[in-house]
């Protein structure tokens, strides 16, 4: 049923030349329906880009965690436990200073606790990208 509804939405958007905003944690739905994706954490943009680029090369640790937590159907993965992003979501009325994901992030740096990262390379809000060079 879900596939039928999503196919209908895609067809209507194409016929009418419109767009749709889907809000979901279902990475499969995103992969099948979205041209572009924005990943939010605590109401703030963590990563944005073309769906293929974000799903094949996630740059923000939260996006990486979401993708790692997606069930797979490959035989070699069926007996493996799904990845869980550590910790819990912060209270949205008490978002910490710095990166909102820093308390759950496995890759934090001292700067993550102090300053909210800007969107770097027009792609992800993460201090880990600050010193990277080249084209993404």
Predicted regions and their residues:
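P-loop NTP-binding/switch modules centered on Walker-like glycine-rich loops
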Residues: 1-78
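Charged, flexible cofactor/metal-binding loops and thiol motifs
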Residues: 50-136
């Amino acid at each position: 049923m879900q596939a039928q509804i999503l196919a209908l939405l895609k067809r209507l958007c194409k016929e009418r030349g419109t767009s749709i905003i889907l809000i979901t944690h279902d990475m499969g739905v995103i992969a099948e329906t979205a041209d572009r994706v924005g990943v939010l954490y605590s109401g703030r943009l963590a990563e944005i880009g073309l769906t293929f680029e974000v799903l094949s090369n996630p740059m923000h640790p939260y996006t990486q965690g979401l993708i790692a937590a997606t069930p797979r159907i490959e035989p070699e993965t069926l007996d493996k436990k799904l990845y869980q992003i550590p910790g819990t979501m912060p209270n949205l009325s008490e978002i910490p200073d710095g990166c909102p994901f820093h308390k759950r992030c496995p890759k934090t740096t001292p700067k993550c606790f102090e300053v909210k990262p800007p969107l770097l390379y027009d792609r992800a809000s993460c201090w880990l990208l600050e010193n990277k060079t080249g084209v993404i």
